Amino acid sequence: MMFTYVVAVASVVALTSAYPTGAPPSACFDMIPGHAADVQTVPAPYTITTAVSSVKAGHSIDVVISGKTPEDKMAGILLEARQGDKIVGTWTVSPDDTFSQPLNCGEPNNAVTHKMHAKELDRQTVSYPWTAPKDLEGDVVFKVTIVKSYAVFWVGIESAPVKVLSH
């Protein structure tokens, strides 16, 4: 009986020790949440898209992440723009946003993560403006890790490449 009680308490502690206030900076490079579960191997029920295939350096585009059905809500995210392995650009998150916040992955506001998790804050669709650096040129891919629940998450879902054009 005591063993069952200890296991139950340990399970609750493990579930609440996931990152309830967003991804930590230590997740910036590999984008893997610190959950004691394996990455999903089935295709993600989410898309990451832009309305355009190119953007001028120094300009912004909207990046949209959507669940394919109303049941495909996001409890947590880590969103970055990458050129190769380098995290590039900056994100704008509204101060009124109850789901998201900027994250500094080596530079201010170069990633987006979730805020304190509460089931009623889960989202099916989110959108963020991304601004390309003024000196950037070439292809950028948007990558997102999506947490549906503590043990169900997908790492590094990629958008189609977006070409950053020089001035």
Swiss-Prot record:
GO terms for biological process: defense response to bacterium; defense response to protozoan; innate immune response. The keyword Disulfide bond applies. In larvae, high expression in the fat body and low expression in midgut, hemocytes and malpighian tubules. No expression in silkgland. InterPro entries: Ferric-chelate_Red/DefProt, Reeler_dom, Reeler_sf. The keyword rRNA-binding does not apply. Residues 1-18 form the signal peptide. GO terms for cellular component: extracellular region; membrane. Gene3D superfamilies: Reeler domain. It is found in: Secreted. Keywords: Antibiotic, Antimicrobial, Disulfide bond, Immunity, Innate immunity, Secreted, Signal. Disulfide bonds join 28-105. Induction: In larvae, by bacterial cells or peptidoglycans. Residues 19-167 form the Reelin domain. May have antimicrobial activity. Belongs to the insect defense protein family. This is Putative defense protein Hdd11-like. It comes from Samia ricini.
